[in-house]
């Protein structure tokens, strides 16, 4: 933990000195971002090491603003000569750039002022032998499941990263985070009747991670359950989305309210602010301040303070996801959603987004379904962000009289996200596992195309 704090402090000092040099060299305004990461991962197949990787990187980006002109440059060379050249190049490029009336740093009143400890790093950094043992344990547990005949491997990894940002109007902030992962992919059956499935877990804290054996067992059991699938007749029917795939629906929604898409007019929700887009009672929350969240940070990449927001409240769309530029385009204020790499200007992105749980258990949610589909896998990217049209390959299980029955595959599910959102009902089994999360979800009236 001491090393993490030290690395963050060193990063802040580095970019603060860079900004001073940039303003001294003639820039009207500037900001800088620093990314550092190190990771270690191990992959095994049939008990033997297959992929062993170690990586470290440091990258720095500088944005110079001259009036309403801007330029972004980046470097991995932190020598004084390289940083001097970086400043000169950025200023020269900014002077030659076209004007953009929406370019600029935030108003100082928007800046974050109080750092928040979000508990994103536990200080645990496993070494390669330990990661290999965890990967082997996950794969062995998958292979031990009756019906599993092969493996695509087990994996384990850990990572650590530092992000620092500062601008010339007084903001400087830094944060650090870590992650621990375990995965397994199992194959069941033989010859032409084989099925595969997987399980994957990632946590910022090692103590929150399920055991490798549990992860491997789930992968094996899921693969066996998929054996001998049938095809469905084409029909309209209720569809229940497993949490593993229900998250994608939340992701489509987040993309549709991204300020860049709204400003371009390329979102199917561009005219729906303040209107009912989900059923009454539905809430979708963006929470950048969640402790141990994968996308948690108390400031965005323009230094704007962040806060937990209801994106959807009682089914109504309440806000867009905005950085400063898209906020100016739309005549609104930044919502603190600026994200940024080192070589490009900021753009909006969600943080920890989740669909709030409902009242019913998954079993209760499907109890009245006489004939429906339980989806566990989605294939392809057949989603039109402009119209909301939705068509994706799927696999899962038939629902008969409220119970999950035999496996099905080679089907396509279709609808329009505007209608799907209005007919969406969440179950009560929400778990925070990734940056985008959802419970089991039911949507009535979708079309299933089979044989």
Give, region by region, the residue ranges found by the protein language model.
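N-terminal small-residue-enriched
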Residues: 1-451
């Amino acid at each position: 933990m001491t090393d993490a704090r030290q690395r963050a402090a060193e990063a802040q000092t580095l970019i603060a000195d860079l900004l001073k040099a940039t303003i001294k060299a003639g820039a009207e305004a500037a900001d800088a971002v620093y990314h550092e990461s190190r990771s270690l991962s191990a992959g095994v197949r049939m008990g033997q090491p297959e992929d062993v990787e170690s990586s470290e990187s440091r990258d720095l980006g500088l944005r110079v603003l001259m009036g309403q002109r801007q330029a972004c440059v980046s470097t991995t060379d932190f020598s004084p000569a390289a940083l001097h050249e970086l400043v000169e190049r950025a200023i020269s490029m900014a002077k030659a750039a076209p004007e953009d009336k929406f370019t600029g740093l935030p108003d100082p009143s928007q800046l974050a002022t109080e750092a928040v400890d979000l508990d994103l790093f536990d200080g645990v950094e496993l070494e390669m032998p330990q990661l290999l043992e965890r990967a082997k344990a996950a794969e062995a547990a998958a292979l031990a499941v009756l019906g599993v005949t092969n493996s695509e491997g087990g994996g384990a990894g850990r990572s650590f990263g530092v992000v620092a940002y500062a601008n010339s109007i007084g903001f400087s902030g830094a944060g650090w985070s870590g992650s621990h992962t375990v995965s397994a992919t199992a194959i069941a059956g033989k010859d032409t009747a084989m099925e595969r499935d997987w399980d994957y877990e990632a946590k910022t804290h090692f103590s929150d991670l399920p055991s490798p054996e549990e992860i491997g067992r789930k992968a094996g059991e899921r693969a066996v359950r998929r054996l001998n699938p049938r095809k469905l007749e084409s029909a309209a029917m209720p569809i229940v989305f497993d949490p593993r795939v229900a998250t994608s629906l939340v992701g489509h929604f987040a993309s549709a309210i991204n300020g860049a898409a709204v400003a371009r007019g390329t979102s199917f929700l561009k005219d729906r602010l303040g209107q009912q887009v989900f059923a009454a009672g539905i809430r979708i929350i963006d929470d950048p301040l969640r402790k141990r969240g994968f996308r948690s940070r108390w400031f965005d990449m323009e230094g704007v303070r962040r806060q937990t927001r209801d994106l959807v409240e009682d089914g109504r769309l309440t806000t867009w996801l905005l950085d400063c530029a898209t906020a100016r385009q739309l005549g609104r204020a930044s919502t603190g959603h600026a994200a940024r790499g080192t070589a490009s200007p900021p753009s909006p992105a969600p943080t920890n987004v989740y669909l709030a749980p409902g009242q019913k258990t998954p079993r209760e949610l499907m109890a009245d379904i006489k004939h429906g589909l339980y989806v566990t896998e989605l294939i392809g990217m057949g989603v039109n962000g402009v119209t909301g049209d939705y068509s994706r390959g799927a696999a899962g299980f038939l629902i008969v009289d409220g119970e999950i029955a035999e496996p099905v595959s080679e089907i396509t599910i279709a609808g329009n996200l505007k209608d799907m959102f209005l007919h969406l009902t969440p179950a009560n089994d929400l778990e925070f596992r990734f940056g985008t999360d959802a419970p089991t979800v039911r949507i009535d009236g979708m079309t299933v195309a089979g044989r």
